[in-house]
Amino acid sequence: MSRVGSYSDDDVAGWLSISPELGGALGAFTDAVYNRNRLPLRVREIARMAVAEANECAVCLGTRDRSGTDAGIDEHFYDHVLEWESWPGYSAEERTAAEFAHRFATDHTALRDDEDFWARCHEHFSDEILTDLALSCALWLGTGRVLRVLDIGQTCKLTL
């Protein structure tokens, strides 16, 4: 049951109307992350799911991208997210994105200070891609936590 308003368990967007200015800004940020960033789809999805697992957000965990199949993303890709360090179906670039996202969500100050990680990260990603990854993780972490804390849309399954 939603902690704000009286929205059904599968309504993931109605609550934004309570705060139209901020809700509209969040909508624009969401659109930018999903439609204008430069992350390869598999990189975006592994990072998104690593944050979703950390947030325990049912909406995020149940969301899929309709163009995923064309990018080689199937349910096995999603089933092994918690095994990002070892599952052979992920590339080194995808593992690095998953590590970034996981640590962004669970231990951000240690991530900041880990020079070995940053050296590995820069082997795979340009500053532009890293910026897109960081901003995307910020959206997923913040929005996922809001949805979870306010118990909004937790039975909703989305296709992007």
Each language-model region and where it sits:
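Mobile cap/lid helix-loop segments that border enzyme active or cofactor-binding sites
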Residues: 1-45, 65-69
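Iron-sulfur (Fe-S) cluster-binding segments and ferredoxin-like electron-carrier domains
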Residues: 23, 61-80
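Alpha-helical scaffolds flanking conserved acidic
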Residues: 40-46, 77, 95, 129-132
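Short, thiol/selenol-centered motifs that function as redox-active sites or metal-ligating centers
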Residues: 44-67
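Short alpha-helical scaffolding segments that buttress acidic/His motifs in well-ordered protein cores
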Residues: 46-51, 81-82, 97-105, 133-144
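Acidic/His metal-coordination segments adjacent to aromatic residues that form catalytic metal sites
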Residues: 83-90
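Acidic/histidine-rich alpha-helical segments that form the ligand environment
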Residues: 93-134
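Preference for long, well-ordered alpha-helical segments
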Residues: 127-160
